[in-house]
Amino acid sequence: MRKGESEQVIEVFQNQLDANLIYVDATDRFLDLLADVDEPERKRKIIGGEFIKVFDEEARKLEGISFLAQGTIYPDILESDGVKAHHNVGGLPEDMDFELVEPVKLLFKDEVRVVGRVLGLPASMVERQPFPGPGLGVRCLGAITRDRLAALRESDAVLREEFAKAGLAEKVWQFFTVVPDFRSTGVRDGKRAFDWPVIIRAVNTVDAMTATVPEIPWAVLQAVTNRILAEVPGVCRVLYDLTPKPVGTIEWE
């Protein structure tokens, strides 16, 4: 999850919507299973399979749990046909004891937001940045490590803060950072550094099937870069991804 995201969801569902929300931190389980796994499709399937296991274990502690609701949207289905696997499309175990409910699976993201507004959900939830099912697992490229995951979470938080300050949060459809699994040579305090690069990804789109790269003001990119290099340990370089979709997908993995 992104920095502060679990707390935000708990706040909305428990305190604002008065829902009987059960929160489970299964971080260690996922990271143990993903150790040394660098192939993106394998990572997605491991994350999806373990997600169902955790859900099943928690559901068995309660009575009358018969349904599994998922936020599958139409681009998930379209992309799963030959582009990349989505754990919620064809990745669930066949012997699952729950009836699957996917109320928005034939809608695009902009249409889902319309439904959310009609239902009266808080704007903070309706307008949240799109987030892949495997979470930060597909933005921490290659085999996931705790140090790169921490750098990813912190750099993403910096990016979101600076975009919000610049008034870009509502103008750019999706923005996030990526941390690859290779290091880069840098200089810090007059000494050689060999640390991770951080890649900034920002796109505008309507349906998530095609996307363009917005022109972010240079001053904003400089502010993001300076803060990441000063505040995020283990990072010595910041890059900006200029690739539209197609050819590149919005997510790197």
Residue ranges and their predicted role:
Residues 1-253:
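ATP/NTP-dependent adenylation/nucleotidyl-transfer catalytic domains that generate, transfer
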